[in-house]
C-alpha cells in the first residue's frame, strides 16, 4: 500500500466514525427531539426571531404574509360533512340566494387544499362567531379547531 491509499482509508474511516457518532447522538436524544418538535410545531411557518420569514417562496399562497398561527388558513375535518377551510376570520363561504352565506364544504382534503391555496383573490368568508350567533355549533367548532 502506498501512502495515498492509506490516506484515503483514514479519511473514509473518520467519515464513517463521524456518521456513527451522529447516529448514536440522535438515537440517545430521540425523545428530546420529539418533545422539541411537538412543542414548536405551531411555529413551523411563522416568522423566526431574527425577523426573516420562514417561508417557502417557490409557491405563493394565502399564508405567506401571515405570522400569527391562528390567522393561517387550514383545512380541517368538519363533523359528518367532509372538510372545510378555516382560520380565525371564519370559514370560506358559499354565497347563496339573497346574499346568504354558508360554509363551503369539500368532499376530500385535496379539494379543500386546492381551493384554499389557489390563486383565487376574491374569497367570501363566513364567520359564525359574530353576534348574535356567538353560541351556535358552527362557532363552537371554529373555536375548537383554532
From Swiss-Prot:
It comes from the Viruses. Its main location: virion. InterPro entries: Poxvirus_A28 (IPR007664). It is a single-pass type III membrane protein. Contains two intramolecular disulfide bonds. They are created by the viral disulfide bond formation pathway, a poxvirus-specific pathway that operates on the cytoplasmic side of the MV membranes. The chain crosses the membrane at residues 1-21. Keywords: Disulfide bond, Fusion of virus membrane with host membrane, Late protein, Membrane, Phosphoprotein, Signal-anchor, Transmembrane, Transmembrane helix, Viral envelope protein, Viral penetration into host cytoplasm, Virion, Virus entry into host cell. It holds the Pfam family Pox_A28. Residues 22-146 are virion surface. One of its GO terms (biological process) is membrane fusion involved in viral entry into host cell. GO terms for cellular component: membrane; viral envelope; virion membrane. It is found in: Virion membrane. Belongs to the orthopoxvirus OPG155 protein family. Part of a stable entry-fusion complex (EFC) which is at least composed of proteins OPG143, OPG147, OPG155, OPG086, OPG094, OPG107, OPG104, and OPG099. Formation of the viral membrane is necessary for the assembly of the complex. Interacts directly with protein OPG107. Envelope protein required for virus entry into host cell and for cell-cell fusion (syncytium formation). This is Envelope protein OPG155. The lineage of its organism: Viruses, Varidnaviria, Bamfordvirae, Nucleocytoviricota, Pokkesviricetes.
